[in-house]
């Protein structure tokens, strides 16, 4: 996209309520996550049993957990861990899925058939169930969570890339590129990818939200981020036995997940409407 087009998208976005609302929520959560890399009110690795389960107050704005750790600090570091896993998983899925989709649409034949059958098999299982099963098979840990969540992102990007690029290969400018002697790989890099980038960005935003949910799910089951590193799913798991006398320990990470997922979905819907006028909805 050139600079003029980016400016038009930005101006359209400022007048789109879903885009603005989603952008504000997403920037808020991303800011907390990034801030945790350089500052948190308290260390999340320091326990203070004497100060456990304190209610929100002047020293601990959101209270403390059953180990005396500051809940706000836990939420901030948990935001980074959850979002980093989700982003890395999207990168893995896109890195494999996009070339698969391009190869299928460019080569057709048995390659296209094999990619489509792989997609059909992958979509036969719910995404979260797939992530949980793969995490259980690979073992607990953030890296294995990235691999597990990334694997269910592969068919998403492969199918979207294939569907978006099929019609482009029949366009006149692609035929002209072939006549000019350009190979398939060069055509994909110079002509196909730039024309489907907007669609891929929108899908990546939606997958980011799903990745946060998936990471929370596998961490809740003890298969994701491991102690002493906090994550929103792990915080929910640890708080479930304390709901009646310390409900904030479960409500706060739950709200963080909801706000992040809601913000990303609103942002994705807004980007879809702005980048694809045919999908624009009346507000």
Question: Whereabouts are the PLM-identified features?
Answer:
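Generic hydrophobic transmembrane alpha-helix motif, especially the helices
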Residues: 61, 65, 71, 95, ...
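N-terminal signal-anchor/first transmembrane alpha helix
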Residues: 1-42, 118, 196
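Short helix-to-coil transition segments within interhelical loops
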Residues: 64-69, 107, 176-195, 236
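Membrane-cytosol interface at the C-terminal ends of specific transmembrane alpha-helices
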Residues: 90-91, 98, 102, 140-190, ...
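Short cytosolic juxtamembrane segments of multi-pass membrane proteins
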Residues: 266-283
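Glycine-rich helix-loop "coupling/hinge" segments at transmembrane-helix boundaries
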Residues: 134-137, 149, 164-165, 214-256, ...
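Short membrane-interfacial helix/loop motifs at transmembrane-helix boundaries
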Residues: 6, 10, 34-73, 222
